Amino acid sequence: MKLIKYPDRSQWNEILKRPVLETENLFDTVRNIINRVRAGGDRVVMEYEAVFDKAELTSLAVTSAEIEEAEKEVPIELKAAIYLAKRNIETFHSAQRFEGKKVDTMEGVTCWQKAVAIEKVGLYIPGGTAPLFSTVLMLAIPAKIAGCKEIVLCTPPDKNGKVHPAILFAARLAGVSKIFKAGGVQAIAAMAYGTESIPKVYKIFGPGNQYVTAAKQLVSLRDVAIDMPAGPSEVEVLADESANPVFVAADLLSQAEHGVDSQAMLVTTSEKLQTEVVYEVERQLGYLTRRDIAEKSLASSKLILVKDMEEALELTNAYAPEHLIIETKDYMEVAGQIVNAGSVFLGAFSPESAGDYASGTNHTLPTNGYAKAYSGVSLDSFIRKITFQEILPSGMSAIGPAIEVMAANEHLDAHKNAVTVRLEEIRK
């Protein structure tokens, strides 16, 4: 961990810099895989599964028998936890339903919007070092609430060709339509272009490593939409002298164990807290099963001491963290001044873990500073809003002359004429 005390503003850009990956060769590799899947379909996807996931497959689809068998393998306490999380996620996302209303912008001119679900969506759930069944809930539940007709899920199998039981249980519970054994770039390509088994979708959601991220970026250039750009997961804890160092250390470690490239940062006005957190992190590390991963992540973590809360807020908004935990005595007042963050956790008893799993908010969030321009996944991510307008003769009489003037000044004669012929008809 790097202890930084009272950094000058000229140092902020360097301090807040995220790791940058060399992507030129990566994109070439990813593009080649995408092109091969696009041309070869299921056969090529299964070839890549054998190479990357060491799984020899004869088909990609997960069968109903496999899902039923998986349900028997999920412990009762985990099922209960997943049910609780599902209820809270449904409650929060159901409250986001769009209720469009008709607006009369002038007499005879009525405008409105209608929310329509994206018909086919693809969800990518990574394999790696942990089964992310929670991400299944975070993506499939709002898709189902939105009314998406087809929810396709791709996730890599283990070397025996099996998908983790908790992922299958969560997928069935959340309303996923079809599940396929496919991971990495090949899964993204399959959902973007379709194969004999895997349907083409209109939008792809879900996290992944740098190869998956690159694949999503490439297919989104012209062929399919994606949720958002993604990078390594990150947390910032913003704290003053009232914060509990045990809690702060636990929050930093909960982020660090995600992966070796995860970002964990403390910004505090208390030198005493900064010192105590260092001790607590070292103490709690000993209890972690993923200690090696957390230690590598913490090597690049930063504990930053600033002179006052005003400076802490400026630094935080400049960083735009994916997750922001505010542990200050006046956390609501501090939160009111946050303008750049993916998801904010308020007070000593609101850890990031709550949002990751079961509070109800979505954990699919903008990373890498994208919180300055992007929102996290919500119900809106799975819908489109179609605009309607109805113009009566009285409305055309009211706005028509202005349209004619504007069109003429943009030298768009046909635009002007489309109004002129109608005005002439009205005046007859």
UniProtKB/Swiss-Prot annotation:
Substrate binds at S233, Q255, H258, H323, D356, E410, H415. One of its GO terms (cellular component) is cytosol. It catalyses: L-histidinol + 2 NAD(+) + H2O = L-histidine + 2 NADH + 3 H(+). The keyword Coiled coil does not apply. Pathway: Amino-acid biosynthesis; L-histidine biosynthesis; L-histidine from 5-phospho-alpha-D-ribose 1-diphosphate: step 9/9. Keywords: Amino-acid biosynthesis, Histidine biosynthesis, Metal-binding, NAD, Oxidoreductase, Zinc. The active site is at E322 (proton acceptor), H323 (proton acceptor). One of its GO terms (molecular function) is zinc ion binding. Zn(2+) binds at Q255, H258, D356, H415. Its cofactor is Zn(2+). Binds 1 zinc ion per subunit. InterPro entries: Ald_DH/histidinol_DH, Histidinol_DH_CS, Histidinol_DH_monofunct, Hstdl_DH. Gene3D superfamilies: 1.20.5.1300, Nitrogenase molybdenum iron protein domain (3.40.50.1980). NAD(+) binds at Y124, Q186, N209. Its EC number is 1.1.1.23. Signal peptide: none annotated. One of its GO terms (biological process) is L-histidine biosynthetic process. It holds the Pfam family Histidinol_dh. Catalyzes the sequential NAD-dependent oxidations of L-histidinol to L-histidinaldehyde and then to L-histidine. Belongs to the histidinol dehydrogenase family. This is Histidinol dehydrogenase.
